[in-house]
Amino acid sequence: SGSCTTKTCWTTLPKFRELGYVLKDKYNEAVQVEPVRASRNKRPTFLKIKKPLSYLKPMDTDLVYIEKSPNYCEEDPVTGSVGTQGRMCNKTAQHSSGCDLMCCGRGYNTHQYSRVWKCNCKF
């Protein structure tokens, strides 16, 4: 009498939230690069990190960019950005809708609103 065991392996994606954290970290540490042409080639042959006197190539795991992102805080008709001035923000939020981040360090005015509505309460 013998026994047989079967093992099945598979790859799964990480939880969406974990993936978001990894991408956000990569975004915060992204490296600006510039294309470099070998002497005889017309097309760029590789990318190098864009720093004075730097000849380092980015690592395969680096998130890289060639041009800096536009400033979304200020209005820019060229990119179509309307900026953040005059938008409502959430004073207590820590993410993109929070006043500290959305107002780009310019400061903000606070307004307190009261709202009355019927709640169909029964006592």
UniProtKB/Swiss-Prot annotation:
PANTHER family in alphabetical order: PROTEIN WNT-7A, WNT RELATED
Lipid-binding residues (covalent, O-palmitoleoyl serine): 1
An annotated GO BP: canonical Wnt signaling pathway
Assigned keywords, A-Z: Developmental protein, Disulfide bond, Extracellular matrix, Glycoprotein, Lipoprotein, Secreted, Wnt signaling pathway
One Pfam family matching this protein: wnt
One of the record's GO cellular component terms: extracellular space
Reported modifications of this chain: Palmitoleoylation is required for efficient binding to frizzled receptors. Depalmitoleoylation leads to Wnt signaling pathway inhibition.
Positions in coiled-coil regions: none
Keyword Mitochondrion assigned: no
Keyword Secreted on entry: yes
Species of provenance: Plethodon jordani (Red-cheeked salamander)
Carbohydrate-modified residues: 90
Name by which UniProt lists this protein: Protein Wnt-7a
Region entry Disordered linker, spans: 33-61
Known function: Ligand for members of the frizzled family of seven transmembrane receptors that functions in the canonical Wnt/beta-catenin signaling pathway. Plays an important role in embryonic development, including dorsal versus ventral patterning during limb development, skeleton development and urogenital tract development. Required for central nervous system (CNS) angiogenesis and blood-brain barrier regulation.
Domain of life: Eukaryota
UniProt-recorded Gene Ontology molecular function terms: cytokine activity; frizzled binding
Disulfide bond positions: 89-104
Family: Belongs to the Wnt family.
Subcellular localization(s) per the UniProt record: Secreted, Extracellular space, Extracellular matrix; Secreted
